[in-house]
Regions:
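N-terminal intrinsically disordered/low-complexity leader segments
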Residues: 1-19, 89, 196-203
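Hydrophobic alpha-helical segments that form the core
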Residues: 4, 100, 107-110, 153-192
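Helix-turn-helix
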Residues: 19, 23, 27-65, 69
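Pre-recognition alpha-helix immediately N-terminal to the DNA-recognition helix
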Residues: 23-31, 77, 103, 107
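Hydrophobic alpha-helical connector segments
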Residues: 69, 83-114, 157, 161, ...
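Short, basic, alpha-helical segments at the C-terminal edge of helix-turn-helix-like DNA-binding modules
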Residues: 72-78
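Amphipathic alpha-helical packing segments from all-alpha helical-bundle domains
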Residues: 79, 83, 103, 110, ...
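Amphipathic alpha-helical segments used for helix-helix packing
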Residues: 103, 107-133, 163, 170-171
Length: 203
């Protein structure tokens, strides 16, 4: 009989815990965006979330953990956007890897514009200690995913387009300029492997 009583109590407790965690992340995002990571304090976050310091440390190890969780959640959404765009392109019969890449890149930039304040937060250079290592690792994994679209001998092409898109992300997020995003994608879409470019020039 006790399990019949305990199960709904446990469920309610779990729901409250999830709601508190969500509120803390929402508050952390707002505080970090408005004050920056360095100037933000745990008390700012719990005050905005109307939660206790104890509840924050129940869910997170501290301010840096909040920041990194926000980053990982944003990147997960971005990965979902780009994967869906690539799948849709292939489902429509697109076989040119560069065109598939551009579709995915557009989805990534659209996500940055839709959540511009959050995207800008991670480009400020104001993250927790060691965040630059996290960003470098993320860029490396991004390049690996891009490489999967192309032939094995097109490594140089992958380096160029990944670097170009990374630079475009920073500028598009800074300006909020959707036309700039489209112009950059149009230019990147014209880039071809060295062998192809040489052949075109000789032709």
């Amino acid at each position: 009989m006790s399990s019949d009583v305990e199960q709904p109590v446990t469920a309610r407790t779990s729901e409250r815990g999830a709601a508190t965690r969500t509120a803390l992340l929402k508050a952390a995002k707002e505080v970090f965006v408005s004050k920056g990571f360095a100037e933000a304090g745990v008390t700012d976050v719990v005050g905005r979330a109307e939660a206790s310091v104890g509840s924050l440390y129940h869910h997170f190890s501290g301010k840096a953990d909040l920041y990194l969780t926000l980053f990982e959640e944003f990147q997960a959404k971005q990965a979902q956007r780009t994967s869906q765009a690539a799948r849709e392109a292939r489902a429509e019969g697109e076989s040119d890897p560069m065109k598939v890449f551009i579709r995915a890149a557009r989805a990534y930039l659209d996500g940055c514009l839709e959540e511009r304040e959050v995207a800008a937060l991670f480009l400020r250079g104001d993250g927790p200690p060691g965040f630059e290592v996290v960003m470098r690792d993320r860029l490396r994994k991004w390049a690996e995913r891009n490489a999967a679209l192309f032939d094995d001998d097109e490594g140089a092409l992958v380096v160029v387009i990944t670097g170009a898109l990374a630079a475009a992300v920073s500028e598009v997020v800074r300006t909020g300029d959707r036309d700039l995003a489209e112009d950059v994608l149009a230019i990147i879409g014209q880039i071809r492997p060295a062998a192809s470019a040489t052949g075109a020039a000789n032709g």
